[in-house]
């Protein structure tokens, strides 16, 4: 890992985290918790085995990740973020929020996984009606399943299928994530292939952290979401 050789905290942070794939490895460890090497590789489509090994060693050297040999029946090494590694979560959340402006287009070769669907509502939305009754929203995007649970003023998410959801949102990732994060409204999401079944009024409870993300240069500004 090369250094910028600058006495600046931004440069020092990039010395540790600025290489390609490094922050995505941190993302996976934040979302999955302690991981086997194979779990990490599965969560990082496109990374070469030797590169993942190198990045993990660099993160270990920087004291952001620990490697522990798990006892049988697991009998494999588990990678886990240290306290310093977990301290990157607010920075990743801020970076993810800033990155919404570049989510207007979904490229044909973009990979997608359920974990990336599940974290978005918890990170990017708040409950606009915290005194309302609990509600459950089932998300289905590119065949990946996640659940939003609203209650007690909290927005919680998990992977999997809900037993009796109040609302089901099913469509391509761009439509589902775009709607949840306020990048597109319900009408536009429908044009993008979203199917909404059930109490669509629940969407009004999901207040985006940024109601109208600033578009990247050359992109049109979306209209506020309306349920």
Q: What do the PLM-derived regions correspond to, one by one?
A:
Residues 18, 71-94:
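Basic, amphipathic "hinge/linker" alpha-helix immediately C-terminal to the N-terminal HTH DNA-binding motif
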Residues 55:
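Residues within the DNA-recognition helix of helix-turn-helix
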Residues 58:
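Alpha-helical DNA-recognition elements
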Residues 8-47:
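N-terminal helix-turn-helix DNA-binding core of bacterial DNA-binding proteins
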Residues 84-150, 200-227:
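Acidic, aliphatic-rich amphipathic alpha-helical segments
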Residues 162-227:
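C-terminal interaction segments
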Residues 50:
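Key DNA-contact positions within bacterial/archaeal DNA-binding proteins
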Residues 64-65:
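Short hydrophobic beta-strand motif reused across regulatory alpha/beta modules
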């Amino acid at each position: 890992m090369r250094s910028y050789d600058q006495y600046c905290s931004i440069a020092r942070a990039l010395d540790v985290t600025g290489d390609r794939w490094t922050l995505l490895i941190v993302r996976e460890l934040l979302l999955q918790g302690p991981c086997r090497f194979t779990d990490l590789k599965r969560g990082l489509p496109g990374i070469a085995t030797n590169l993942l090994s190198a990045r993990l060693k660099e993160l270990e050297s920087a004291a952001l990740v620990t490697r522990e040999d798990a006892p049988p029946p697991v009998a494999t090494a588990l990678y886990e973020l240290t306290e310093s590694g977990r301290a990157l979560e607010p920075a990743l959340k801020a970076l993810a929020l800033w990155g919404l402006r570049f989510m207007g287009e979904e490229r044909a070769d973009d990979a997608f996984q359920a974990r990336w669907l599940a974290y978005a509502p918890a990170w990017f939305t708040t409950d606009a009606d915290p005194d309302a009754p609990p509600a459950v929203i089932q998300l289905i995007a590119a065949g990946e399943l996640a659940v939003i649970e609203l209650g007690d003023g909290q927005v919680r998410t998990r992977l999997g299928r809900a037993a009796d959801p109040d609302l089901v949102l099913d469509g391509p990732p761009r439509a589902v994530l775009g709607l949840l994060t306020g990048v597109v409204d319900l009408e536009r999401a429908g044009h993008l292939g979203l199917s909404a079944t059930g109490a669509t009024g629940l969407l009004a409870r999901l207040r985006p952290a940024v109601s109208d993300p600033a578009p990247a240069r050359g992109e049109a500004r979306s209209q506020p979401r309306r349920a």
